[in-house]
Amino acid sequence: MQNAVSQAISQGIHVRREILGSLTYEQRVFLLEDLFVDLFGHQHVMLQRWAALTGQSAQVDTGYIAQFVASIVLGEPGQGFRGKGDDLADGSEVKSAANISGVDRPRWNHNLGSLDDDEHRRSRGLPTAGEEYLGVPYMFYLLVDRPHGVSDPAPIRIRAWCIDAQEDGDWRDLFETFLTSRRGRTYNFQLHPPVGYDDDVVVNTLGNLDFSNVLVFDARLSLADRDRPEIDWHVPLPTQVIPVTGRTRALRYGGRGARPTRLTNTADIVLGTNDLGALFPGVLAPRDSYDLATVSEIETEAEVEEYS
């Protein structure tokens, strides 16, 4: 990296760290609510419009959004990289998963490298991917889903958890168990977040983790009135997140089917084509048409059987 670029990034980190660190509690809450409405509310409504026409998912890509949230909550900026380097300037990692409008089960993926990758990195005098993960100060996890069994339209739920990666023994033990269990080209350690569940149980076949003591917040975004979105803090953001005093708790893996998939409402996955005239006035005329939600119900049932 050229010196000028390196200096610019370093200066940007310094300035943003001061700005983020000086935010009051009320300012952090205001910024988070504004972000939730902009990126989870308005963007999802816009995507639904185009999904009705194309039959594609109205899922919101939460990757970079989760990093925005983490920076506001933890007061730590990013480095301006796109997919390269640390997610936060202090070396912390951010993971996101979302199921606002879709039928597949999201996961938090951790690329810990294969055995061959480990050997290659060590031959160059570099730490392995697993060693780098276990060396980060904090792991910030974000999940965006909808509460199960809530009246239509169900609110968009945004939850975050933060782990002290140096002090959380059960979290570290599970990572190390995966690292020692690798065979061949196995590299991806997947944690299944509690999509559609009100608890904080994170699932992996090597063992589950209870995240309830590291929950940072639980916010619900209602779009019942799309012109006036409302946010309810089911679990408010604490006034202080760092240092993280809570710890995860190891649980036994319950076996396949112990926690069946809970999907979003079918009509939210694929809107009916009879809405297209109103969604695209001047281009498409209102007309009676076969409602694709009926087809979607059949597709969803098949997906539930596949992923359960």
Swiss-Prot record:
It is an enzyme of class 3 (hydrolase). Its EC number is 3.1.21.4. It comes from the Bacteria. One of its GO terms (biological process) is DNA restriction-modification system. Keywords: Endonuclease, Hydrolase, Nuclease, Restriction system. Pfam families: RE_MamI. The keyword Nuclease applies. It catalyses: Endonucleolytic cleavage of DNA to give specific double-stranded fragments with terminal 5'-phosphates. GO terms for molecular function: DNA binding; type II site-specific deoxyribonuclease activity. This is Type II restriction enzyme MamI. It comes from Microbacterium ammoniaphilum. The gene is mamIR.
